[in-house]
């Protein structure tokens, strides 16, 4: 929009090209990165992401030398509590974020300075010519004793009243946003077969008469599970977890949770 400043986002190694692109779009400036990715977040099933400290710091220093404005993402790692961790998707895959949002940030998840913090701090000192203030004392850590589980409660004995329906309902259909939804039906006698779930969002544990048969994971592109023979009528339970909502691009429109197909 005319008159409104524009910013550009990028990670390590993309600063020069990023600002060249921004200058073509907004030759009069201001020149700012809205998100300079100081690290990266993790998805379940992946290794922890890290970026090279020296390369990060050198690029950061170069941007300061050019007089560019830099908004660092993230400066302080964090934690996504509860079911609020989010997810990524390109429309075909599904990558749920971990609870930890440490991000390999200059300040880690517990608020402690990292080598990246020191490198960025030194870069600021060189550009400004100012001596940094002394760091505060490290945050004390404590080791807690192992807590033995004294009590537990069975899921099966604590289910809420069911919502009966002739068609599959999503979490949103029953005014639920996060957590778990349990689908239950009775299955007639029959030979071994296959359960096929179209549109699983996101992770299912499948039970036959309260015995775990297996799991189906959207993250792994799974949609099928072999079922054993049924000699007597059985209760089939499918416990579906919302593993995190995709929060950008047009994929948002398809992010209902539970069983979204058939």
Functional labels for PLM-detected ranges:
Residues 34-39, 63-68, 75-262:
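Carbohydrate-binding surfaces of carbohydrate-active enzymes
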Residues 1-72:
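Substrate-binding/catalytic cleft of secreted carbohydrate-active enzymes
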